[in-house]
Amino acid sequence: MGVRAPAMMYEPGMGYSVGVSGLYCEFMKNILEAIENGADSAAFAALTIAATYRAAVVLKSEQEMFAGVASADKDPRKSVHVQEVATPEIAPDEVLIAVMASSINFNTVWTSIFEPISTFGALARLARESSWAKRHDLDYHVIGSDASGVVLRVGSAVRNWKPGDKITVHCNMYSMAAVFQWVW
């Protein structure tokens, strides 16, 4: 199983090639250079954030596409799409990271085959909890729960992380506003 999208290729000292717009390329180039040069937190905080990013998504309009199909016959390649999505405003207890590597785990597969339930129902319920949570009730859902990358922005309630921190993200859910802010 896999989804392939035009990739930005980068190797230190080798320059950049793109499969996306020049503006996006410049955005990623600046992040990669900051990492490579050991930039401090202030330099990461000063980076301009792109208005959109490329993401693997499932679509609300397709959540019934596997109705009546046995689980073993549901093919995630049919439901996962790669598209540009708006970069969200971060909530006080959230961080914005530039993902440098990600993986597929059981949550990704379940989301892509809409089992055991469609995540769109859970996101709609979450949206009723607060104005910040409402931002997640969209016509698409960005999938993925395991990643590594670098922190670009932190919400006002985040205390243990700062722009420039290199992090690993896992699928357990912890609040960034909690006493123990967990990112592995």
Could you say what each language-model-derived stretch is?
Residues 34-46, 63-101, 106, 140-142, ...:
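A short N-terminal beta-strand-loop micro-motif at the entrance of redox/enzyme domains
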Residues 107-111:
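Cytochrome P450 core scaffold surrounding the K-helix E-X-X-R motif
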Residues 179-184:
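Short, compositionally biased
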Residues 49-56:
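Short structural boundary motif marking the start of a folded domain
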Residues 56-57, 168:
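Residues in well-ordered beta-strands of folded domains
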Residues 1-27, 31:
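C-terminal glycine/acidic-rich active-site capping loop/insertion
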Residues 86-103, 117-177:
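Glycine-rich beta-strand-centered segment in the early N-terminal region that forms part
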